[in-house]
């Protein structure tokens, strides 16, 4: 890419491509500079440094994931929406492994405040509207869904299931079905360890 065509967007796109091809750990200022055909110093005209570069790629991945989830869940509700939501995450993780790695980074304040992050959060909460989860429990339910999906995908990525012959697709479907049942029977009140009646 000629230097004249460089922009913040082009640099971030290059970082995301590099992450998918070589892994998120391969993304450095020097490697991205090589990717776009300039010297590392030229990149600093467009990004403040490595952290800003990774943040940009993180936000890019959030935006792409949000778009994929929105398309998948459009017009669906309840279990159908949940399955589409989960499958969209799995497809993105499979199709963009490096970008998925970037999504597992601890989000910076600017990433958390981005419209892309807000959209992912809104889509998650919208998916939960098809279940009888009380308003004050929706954040907990969203964390539960996220932990289940991300945990399964992380284990798959690390070949944790490779030693068994049972198909991972069947395990995935069972996990999503279990999520559906848990959300459908989410209790109206939660008992926390600090509650007096639960400390006997």
Report each predicted region and the residues it spans:
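An amphipathic alpha-helix adjacent to DNA-recognition modules
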Residues: 8-16, 20, 25-26, 37, ...
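Hydrophobic alpha-helical connector segments
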Residues: 70-101, 118-121, 135, 141-145
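Amphipathic C-terminal alpha-helical segment
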Residues: 147-165, 180-189
């Amino acid at each position: 890419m000629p230097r004249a065509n460089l922009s913040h967007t082009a640099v971030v796109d290059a970082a995301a491509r590099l992450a998918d091809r070589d892994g998120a750990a391969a993304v450095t200022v020097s490697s991205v500079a090589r990717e776009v055909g300039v010297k590392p110093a030229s990149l600093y005209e467009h990004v403040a440094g490595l952290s800003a570069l990774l943040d940009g790629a993180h936000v890019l991945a959030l935006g792409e994931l949000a778009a994929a989830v929105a398309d998948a869940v459009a017009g669906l509700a309840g279990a159908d929406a949940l399955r589409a939501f989960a499958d969209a995450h799995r497809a993105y993780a499979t199709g963009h492994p490096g970008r998925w790695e970037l999504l597992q980074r601890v989000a910076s304040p600017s990433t958390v405040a981005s419209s892309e992050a807000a959209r992912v959060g809104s889509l998650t909460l919208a998916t939960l509207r098809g279940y009888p989860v009380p308003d004050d429990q929706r954040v907990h339910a969203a964390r539960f869904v996220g932990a289940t999906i991300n945990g399964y995908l992380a284990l798959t990525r690390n070949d944790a299931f490779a030693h068994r012959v049972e198909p991972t697709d069947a395990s995935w479907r069972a996990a999503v079905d279990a999520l559906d049942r848990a959300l459908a029977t989410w209790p109206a009140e939660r008992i926390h360890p600090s509650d007096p009646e639960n400390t006997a």
